[in-house]
């Protein structure tokens, strides 16, 4: 497994571990603000992982498709991807400044 895949898998396993902890918190009737804080942390981890996966897709598959003259096809694919997760573009300074 290459470095990119290791990073993504590790981040997902970390998020899963946090979710398991949140489940225990709910089962033990923990204080709601503490649960919300942990949920927010997991959401942040998943959003960061989503951005990393999207960036990898841009740097590999999209760049390759553009070089191969399949720009229209890849634009359609990207539009479809963004339809499901618009947050992927959030909090990226280069995009926010445009």
Model-derived segments and spans:
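Solvent-exposed interaction patches of small proteins and small membrane subunits
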Residues: 1-98
């Amino acid at each position: 497994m290459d470095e990119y895949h290791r990073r993504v898998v590790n981040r997902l396993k970390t998020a899963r571990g946090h979710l398991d902890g949140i489940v225990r918190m709910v089962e033990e009737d923990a204080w709601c603000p503490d649960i919300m804080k942990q949920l927010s942390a997991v959401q942040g981890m998943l959003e960061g992982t989503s951005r990393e996966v999207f960036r990898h897709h841009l740097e590999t598959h999209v760049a390759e498709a553009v070089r191969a003259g399949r720009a229209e096809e890849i634009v359609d694919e990207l539009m479809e991807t963004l339809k499901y997760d618009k947050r992927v573009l959030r909090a990226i300074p280069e995009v926010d400044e445009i």
